């Protein structure tokens, strides 16, 4: 009899314990379901390419269910001011966001310097290793992962030679302050010089010197190439104005800049880069550790043409190039 009572007592206690565990799990799941996820986004500067990345990030989060009252997104823009990057990075960290996202290299660097605990998601960084954000793209060792959009340089040089076969000297316009630009410049020089092109670098410290530098360049080069460079992108209208006056084609690395007056690019869609960045963030938000989320490397692109610019510069687009290209701007009829 005593043994039966003991058994029933143990069964009763087990039921109570399991019930308590189940209740706790239900409460936790309920709390997780109702938790407001906090996402901090730091954008380096305002220009169309980065704006498209930011839009892609927000839309990508929405598609993953992070929308409405389920998410609080704080977007800060440093407008190219390095001191603001430091201040804003600390603000997003102090706000205890679940993840922080840096759009452009300086923004990602600022966030990575501000925290070693909160996951930092890179928003389309061309050279994360060179920028000292990660050491290993496949196995991020710290709290930083995200997307890396590596410019398809070899394809770009081939496009330059196809569209402007008589161009012998290519001028590269970039900002000396941007680490991400320097690696692209070195890569472009390697492929271009291998193909017999003469490459001349024109580095500017800020947007203030672009107009003067363009005046010098246009008398010495046959075509201009700009890397993924936020300083140049934010003053691209100045570049195009000077190039148009001199009747010199400008090759870019971004689809939005072809729409703004560049002749052509082997482009990566900036909006889709933003959505890829969101996918990396979602993996971390759903519980994956940063070290288990490899950097998403996007290194291909699609030839993108501005046929109106080609028309204005009397450049004939070969049929084989035309067939495989996206058209950003049509020619006048």
Locate each region found by the language model.
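Beta-alpha junction/loop-to-helix N-cap segments that form part of ligand/metal-binding clefts
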Residues: 75-135, 229-244, 248
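Pocket-lining segment of extracytoplasmic ligand-binding domains
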Residues: 179-248, 254
């Amino acid at each position: 009899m005593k043994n039966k009572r003991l058994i029933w007592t143990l069964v009763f206690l087990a039921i109570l314990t399991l019930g308590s565990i189940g209740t706790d799990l239900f409460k936790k799941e309920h709390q997780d379901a109702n938790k407001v996820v906090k996402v901090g986004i730091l954008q380096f500067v305002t220009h169309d390419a980065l704006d498209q990345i930011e839009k892609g990030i927000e839309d990508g989060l929405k598609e993953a269910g992070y929308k409405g009252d389920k998410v609080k997104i704080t977007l800060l823009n440093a407008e190219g001011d390095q001191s603001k990057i430091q201040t804003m990075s600390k603000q997003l960290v102090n706000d205890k966001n679940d993840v922080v996202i840096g759009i452009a290299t300086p923004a990602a660097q600022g966030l990575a310097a501000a925290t070693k605990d909160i996951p930092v998601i890179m928003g389309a960084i061309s050279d994360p290793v060179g920028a000292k954000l990660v050491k290993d793209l496949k196995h991020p060792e710290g709290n930083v992962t995200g997307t890396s959009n590596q410019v398809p340089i070899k394809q770009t040089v081939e496009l330059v030679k196809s569209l402007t076969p008589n161009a012998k000297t290519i001028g590269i316009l970039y900002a000396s302050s941007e680490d991400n630009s320097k690696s692209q410049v070195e890569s472009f020089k390697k492929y271009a010089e291998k193909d017999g092109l003469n490459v001349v670098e024109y580095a500017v410290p800020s947007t203030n010197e672009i107009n003067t530098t363009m005046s010098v360049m246009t008398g010495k080069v046959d075509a201009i190439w700009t890397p993924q460079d936020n300083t140049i992108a934010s003053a691209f209208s100045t570049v195009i104005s000077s190039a148009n006056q001199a009747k010199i084609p400008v090759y870019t690395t971004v689809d939005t800049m072809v729409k703004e007056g560049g002749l052509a690019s082997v482009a990566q869609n900036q909006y889709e880069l933003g959505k890829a960045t969101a996918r990396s963030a979602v993996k971390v938000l759903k519980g994956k550790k940063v070290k288990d989320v490899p950097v998403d490397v996007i290194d291909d692109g699609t030839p993108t043409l501005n046929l109106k610019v080609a028309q204005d510069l009397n450049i004939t687009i070969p049929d084989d190039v035309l067939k495989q290209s996206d058209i950003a701007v049509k020619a006048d009829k």
